[in-house]
């Protein structure tokens, strides 16, 4: 049976997969927030094992209708470890029945009682942060190349990865970019290769053969995207001459160039950094019999007859979210024909070697400053591969191995690689605000105390070492990360939400929620937020916007949009306004003028980027309902109202126009990729969208004008609650880079609690 381990206990043992040990793990705070799964064959009662088998069977049977796991393995474990003693009857409200405060209060207590049982001992809420389907392949390819696949991933790990891939294979035989997406060559070719590397035969369960047919029917693997071409090249089933150039020498260019990688969005920068190393070395792993076989399986013509030059720009129409503009094709052709032939030979090759050394310096800096977690799963495995390519026996490679487990999560649909090492801090700050909104927070002092400790101990206390300008890093001291302090990358909205949470908790007695954060640390957080405001008033994610929008012309990733620079977002900007406004109320004398100017500019930015129909586009959640919540909440925090601000007026009208006839809101991920509001299939409501819309409208004073939509939405949330106080997992609600969805599994609990809490206190009690 699989067991979730948290925090310090994760450093004991090897994660059940071999290769990891306490010797090769580093931590700033005793692994706070770390979450790994271990397999223990002796664990589990017959009843628990049957529960797990039943959950797996139900997922398989409904896999084409319900793509998202319900995170049941974790819930089964916590039900045994933290049983709830509360016995509050379930509430259901008929369509003709009035929503009463008593019913809302009972629903909230049942919800928080349950949610408290799935809180980890260290104070955060673990959960599934999967969704993308292109992450596990990079890991399996890297482990296969380095000869550590079977040594590091146990047969149980490999079995669960195969289960996950089979569960999320589409009916046509392919795999999408994410669990709810239609089949793409990127997803299908990579996951097909993954199954083969894991030992599945060419006709495995009929599904492998079906996947190969999809690949061949769509032109073969030469039509995979540029990221896919890179992975296939290092594996040895595609030639480097079929890639557009990624010259590492760009890292030697002066920073004043607008296209310098140091000016790019950090995720983009940190992915193309190791890619440029592998490209510059033309690195290829061992050519095994499986690799030889894959060369025959993946293409419509014999491998030696493929026109690799033509394949450089070949991309399946199913993958083409961001087609290459002409200027990009000209750039790649120039580098391919004129630049690369020179730098492959002496004397220019000496400059390449210098560039490769520089790239490896930056890779090691990233590794060391994230305790070998890295900023995300893509550069995690790429950096690990680069360390092995540099020296297979290096300490750096050994330090990478145990941190793989930080990214692996298991649910009833199998084992997946998450989009980060978790969403620990982010979810915890939202959970705190949700519980506090209910006005019954004192009843859950132990839950809040543990969450408070987690948030306090996850704040980044030091800047990265060395010259930050040389390493292209922003200040970190005082910031909060998305996940753990060991990860450590500072983020604007995480810092804002962390600051909001600790300020709100400071209003409670320390006997209830623990000691407040030292005021100097609040000042540090404010300093980070103020330092991240761009000249247009907006806030980006990790850093200031360092270059120009036109740089997107050289975005080589056909699958993703707006990845080259760190753009300002309504979500990040709103969070900054909210945090600074809250801070200013308690500490009015600290940098008052700077804070007021920052808030004013940020509010103006939010107004300026609003669409003419009253909407904002959500870049990190689905989609217009998510952004609408942030947009309205930010403007209200800045002092705007429905009466004196046309932006809030228009935003409310927009949200109300999207309310479903049955009540509530239900927005499809298609809104993100198509940039047009799209309802879920059959116009179903979604509890998370409904929660966001409710919170936005309540903040904008909808209860004073017409509370009817709020009553209907509250009824949806109350009636959605499950018998044990949990809420159902519905469609995927997270997004990044416009086109890829990601799971925020905690949202199903957080936002019904938050919305009903605000509804109870600000709507029902105001009537």
Swiss-Prot record:
GO cellular component: lipid droplet
Ranges: PFTB repeats: 158-199, 522-567, 599-639, 648-689, 710-751
Record-listed E.C. numbers: 5.4.99.8
Catalytic machinery residues: 493 (proton donor)
Lineage: superkingdom: Eukaryota
Matches recorded under SUPFAM superfamilies: Terpenoid cyclases/Protein prenyltransferases
Alphabetized GO MF terms: cycloartenol synthase activity
Annotated protein name in UniProt: Cycloartenol synthase
Signal peptide: none
Gene, per the UniProt record: CASBPX1
Region annotation Disordered: where it falls in the sequence: 1-22
Catalysed conversion reaction: (S)-2,3-epoxysqualene = cycloartenol
InterPro entries, per the entry: SQ_cyclase_C (IPR032696), SQ_cyclase_N (IPR032697), Squalene_cyclase (IPR018333), Terpene_synthase_CS (IPR002365), Terpenoid_cyclase/PrenylTrfase (IPR008930)
């Amino acid at each position: 049976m699989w067991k979730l381990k948290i925090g310090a206990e994760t450093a004991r043992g090897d994660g059940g997969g071999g290769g990891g040990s306490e010797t090769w793990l580093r931590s700033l705070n005793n692994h706070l927030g770390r979450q790994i799964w271990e397999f223990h064959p002796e664990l589990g009662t017959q009843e628990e094992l049957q529960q797990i088998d039943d959950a797996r069977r139900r997922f398989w049977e409904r896999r084409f209708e319900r793509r998202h796991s319900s995170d049941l393995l974790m819930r089964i474990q916590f039900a045994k470890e933290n049983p709830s003693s509360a016995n509050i009857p379930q509430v259901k409200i008929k369509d003709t029945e009035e929503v009463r405060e008593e019913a809302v209060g009972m629903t909230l207590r049942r919800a928080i009682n349950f949610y408290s049982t799935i809180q980890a001992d260290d104070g955060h809420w673990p959960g599934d942060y999967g969704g993308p389907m292109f992450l596990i392949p990079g890991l399996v390819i890297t482990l296969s190349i380095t000869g550590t696949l079977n040594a590091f991933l146990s047969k149980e790990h490999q079995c669960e990865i195969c289960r996950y891939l089979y569960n999320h294979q589409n009916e046509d035989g392919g795999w999408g970019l994410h669990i709810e997406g239609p089949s793409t060559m990127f997803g299908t070719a990579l996951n097909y290769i993954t199954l083969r590397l894991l030992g599945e035969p060419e006709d495995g369960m009929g599904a492998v053969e079906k996947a190969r047919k999809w690949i061949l029917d769509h032109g073969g693997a030469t039509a995979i995207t540029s990221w896919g071409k890179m992975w296939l090249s290092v594996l040895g089933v595609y030639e480097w001459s079929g890639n557009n150039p990624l010259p590492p020498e760009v890292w030697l260019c002066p920073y004043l160039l607008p296209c310098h990688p140091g000016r790019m969005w950090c995720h983009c920068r940190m992915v193309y950094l190791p890619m440029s190393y592998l490209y510059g070395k033309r690195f290829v792993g061992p050519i095994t019999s499986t690799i030889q076989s894959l060369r025959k399986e993946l293409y419509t013509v014999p491998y030696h007859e493929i026109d690799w030059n033509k394949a450089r720009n070949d991309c399946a129409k199913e993958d083409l979210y961001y087609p290459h503009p002409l200027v990009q094709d000209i750039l790649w052709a120039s580098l391919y024909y004129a630049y690369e032939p020179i730098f492959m030979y002496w004397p220019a090759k000496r400059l390449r070697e210098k560039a490769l050394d520089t790239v490896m310096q930056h890779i090691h800096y990233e590794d060391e400053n994230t305790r070998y977690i890295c900023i995300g799963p893509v550069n995690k495995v790429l950096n690990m591969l680069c360390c092995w390519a540099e020296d297979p026996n290096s300490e750096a490679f050994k330090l990478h191995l145990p941190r793989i487990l930080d990214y692996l999560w298991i649910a009833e649909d199998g084992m997946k690689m998450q989009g980060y090492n978790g969403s620990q801090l982010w979810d915890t700050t939202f959970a705190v605000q949700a519980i506090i909104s209910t006005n019954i927070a004192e009843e859950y002092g132990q839950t809040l105390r543990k969450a408070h400790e987690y948030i306090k101990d996850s704040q980044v206390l030091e800047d990265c070492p060395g010259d930050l300008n040389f390493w292209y890093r922003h200040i970190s001291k005082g910031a909060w990360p998305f996940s753990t302090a060991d990860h450590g990358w500072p983020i604007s909205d995480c810092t804002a939400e962390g600051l909001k949470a600790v300020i709100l908790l400071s209003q409670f007695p320390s006997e209830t929620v623990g000691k407040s954060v030292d005021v100097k640390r609040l000042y540090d957080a404010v300093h980070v937020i103020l330092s991240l405001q761009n000249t247009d008033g907006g806030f980006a994610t990790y850093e200031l916007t360092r270059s120009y929008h036109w740089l997107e012309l050289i975005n080589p990733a056909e699958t993703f949009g707006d990845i080259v620079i760190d753009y300002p977002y309504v979500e990040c900007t709103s969070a900054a306004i909210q945090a600074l406004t809250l801070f200013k109320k308690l500490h009015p004398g600290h940098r008052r003028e700077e804070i007021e100017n920052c808030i004013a500019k940020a509010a103006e930015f939010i107004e300026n980027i609003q669409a003419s129909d009253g909407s904002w586009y959500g870049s990190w959640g689905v989609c217009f309902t998510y952004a609408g919540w942030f947009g309205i909440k930010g403007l209200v925090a800045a002092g705007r109202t429905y009466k004196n601000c046309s932006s809030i007026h228009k935003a409310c009208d927009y949200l109300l126009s999207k309310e479903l006839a049955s009540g509530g809101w239900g927005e499809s991920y298609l809104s993100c990729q198509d940039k047009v509001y799209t309802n879920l299939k059959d116009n179903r409501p979604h509890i998370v969208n409904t929660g966001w819309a409710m919170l936005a409208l309540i903040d904008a004073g909808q209860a004073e004008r017409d509370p009817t939509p709020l009553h209907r939405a509250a009824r949806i949330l109350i009636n959605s609650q499950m018998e044990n106080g949990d809420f159902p997992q519905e469609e995927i609600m997270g997004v990044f880079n416009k086109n890829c969805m990601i799971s925020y599994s905690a949202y199903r609990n957080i936002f019904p609690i938050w919305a009903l809490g605000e509804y109870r206190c600000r709507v029902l009690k105001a009537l």
